[in-house]
Every structure is written in structure tokens, then in C-alpha cells.
Amino acid sequence: MKKTAILTVLLMAAVSTSAQRKAEPYFTFRELPNMLKWCPAPPDTVGAAFAYDIMQYMWGKEMRQKDPARTAIAIRDAVYSLECIMQEFSEPLGLKMSEEETPEIFALLSDAKVTCENISNFPKFYYKRIRPFMRFHEHTATPQFEPDLRRNFSYPSGHTILGWCSALLLSEVNPERADTLLTRGMMYGESRVIVGAHWQSDVDAGRLAAAATYARMHTSERFLEQMRRARQEFRIKTGLATPEEIKAYNKKEKKKTKK
């Protein structure tokens, strides 16, 4: 009983952190790989690639009619926020995530999110690609977001970059659930086609951008330290950490607080 109480106190101290942190990108857009130099441009309006985009757009419309359960997931995925990411990926990860309960994982994902935005903004405004629902003068499954979508260009898919990069990061936090996390990450991008907000090639480019961002972040010492802290937090929260690990982590936190 006494040992359990001590471990509980140590655990609570180990995972505590200050609230309301401001997200800071690991790299600026100039420091990230330039998508214009290595990622294919969006397909023009003739040829097989664009024909496939149209076929996938029609497939998305069919899915909205045939599979209401999958469509409901796609509609949830349409909310562009870190809260949505944590909600949708908590079950695949095997741990409920939130800013309050998992502050280190939150910090990892929060800084990664703004880094992902840095890689996508320039190509979006360079290509100025029109979204499929606009080309066909139709509505998406998420009409409440259409005004914002009309002001923001289509290529690459920012939702897909965030979803796939989050899946890669969380697979590193918990490698044992990598298959499940990556499956959910693939679904997150697919959801953009299902709701009608993106072409398939937007989603494909988004996954490439996410992979490039993920690789670049691994050259940042700050990122590597935050990943270490996130993995440690996961082990503590899921009961995988040894008492020695918890004590060592708590000792380091105390030293950090004194500085």
C-alpha cells in the first residue's frame, strides 16, 4: 500500500507541467524542404492523372450515400484542430490525450502542427488550385466550412499533412500500435476526398509533405528532446515505466524548475 502511494505521488509530479503554452514551430518555412522543387505539381485538367482525381471525387460522393458511418468519421475529421487530432487518435494510441492529461504529447503535436503549416502555405498560394466542389459547383458534406475552404487553396491538403504527420509522430511514441495509428492516419487523409473538400492528388501530396516534415523535424535537438519526453510520459501514463524511470524523470523536472 505504501509503495503504491509513493509511486502515485511520483507519477503525478512527473507528468505535471505549466498550462497554456504557445506553439513554436521546429522550423520556419524557409528551413523546411521546398515542395516546389521535389513534389509533383497538381495535375492539369487533361490527362490520366486528372481523370483519376475526378473518379475519386465521384467515389467520395458515392461513399457519402452508401456508408454513413464512414462519412460521419470524415465529417469529424474535417475539424482542423489539435483537439480533433487528439480525440481521433487517442484510441489508436492506447491513451486518452489532452493538453491537461498528456502535456508532453500535446507539446510535441502542437509544435509539429505549426511546423506542418509552414511547409504547406507556400505551395497552396503558388499553385492556387481550385477545390473539386467549387469546380463542379456542388456542396461538400461539411457546408459550414465551405466559406473558409473557398478562401484557401486545395494543393496540398493541409488536413492530410497534419493527420499523417501526427500518425507518424504517435507511432514513434508508441511503436507497438504503429499499424493502428498509421491506418487511422491514412483514413484522415481519405476523409478529405469523402467530404468533397480535396482532390485525391491533394491528399497524396499532403502525405509526401508530412513525411518530409517528419524527417526534417528529426534534425532538431529540441524536437528530439520533446519526443523523448512524450515517450516517457506515455510510458508513465500507461504503467510501462519502472519506478526508477519515474524517479529519474521527476528528478530532472525538479532541476529544470530550479533553473
Where are these regions (language model features)?
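Positively charged n-region of N-terminal signal peptides that target proteins for export
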Residues: 1-4
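Hydrophobic alpha-helical bundle signature of multipass membrane enzymes
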Residues: 21-195, 216-222, 226, 232, ...
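Histidine-centered divalent metal-coordination motifs
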Residues: 159, 198, 206
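Hydrophobic h-region of N-terminal signal peptides that target proteins for export
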Residues: 10-18
